Amino acid sequence: MYLTRLALTDFRSYPELSIELGPGVTTFSGPNGEGKTNLVEAIGYLATLGSHRVATDSPLVRRGADAAVLRAAVTGAQGNTLVEIEINPGRANRVRLNRAPMPRPRDILGALRTVLFAPEDLALVKGDPGERRRFLDELLVATAPRYAGLRADYERVLRQRTALLKSAGSKGHLRGAARESMTATLDAWDAQLAQAGAPLLAGRMRLVAALRPHVTAAYEAVSGGPPGESCEISYRASVFNNNEFDNDVPGLEVAMLKALAGVRASELDRGVCLVGPHRDELELSVGGLPARGYASHDESWSPTPSRS
């Protein structure tokens, strides 16, 4: 798969841009501030529907413009594909695939696939667990686009269940019929959260298992470190003790329900959901020690490019 053309309208510093590309290596060169990173960011956005530099879309639209348009012509095993995204800050983005409007932005995922290595990727080692979860989910969606819908479903249920926990906590200790009603409502949301979370959890665990040997081999090739000082990755799920689990979806759903029941009192006290994929961690270790706390700055870079 490779790009044959990239066209931008009002994206970042570019009022209009159209460049022809081809197979093989393409290098963008020029003085600082000329927009080289903006080109890479645009390609990444077309592939993932997100920027590696900012969390919202507003900075992506050129100052004074209402919207930005990104287009990429892609050649791959399935032939030629035209991917188009219209970025509308504050409104729904619009996407087209081969000029046909798609009902949801995520419907274009998989049409263009990329691997990015940027300074921001150091957060994969040094950043918060949320950065590593986001990386896992982006990679999961890139390999199997259906996970975009599964992740969206889980996040929707999580928001609604969290709102219920906060509401219940603000009412103090309920009694009688009110308590029974709240318990029944929480039971229903627990079931929905487990049903939505189990497939996402299973996908993440399978992905980590598939990545593990490649990460170890890539780290050794990049670092040139002493024998035995390898990089390992593992997935720590909040719904299990001692990381003893199976990655079949029905079993994970049961495990989530059990874990949710075990922390319900604490969740009501704190008004937050304490277990589930949103609380899990992708752990990286170098030489048997956590990379986040023990690796030097230079060592922290080695596991980062190895993900490609």
Language-model segment annotations:
Residues M1-P31, Y45, L174-S308:
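Conserved NTPase motor "head" modules and their coupling/switch loops across ABC/AAA+ ATPases, GTPases
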Residues N32, G50, L140-T143, Y147, ...:
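Flexible interhelical turns and helix-capping residues at alpha-helix boundaries
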Residues K36:
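Conserved lysine of the Walker
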Residues G44-Y147, A209, P213-E220, L252-A265:
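Nucleotide-state sensing region of NTPase/ATPase domains
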Residues R106-A111, P119-Q195:
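A conserved P-loop NTPase coupling/switch region
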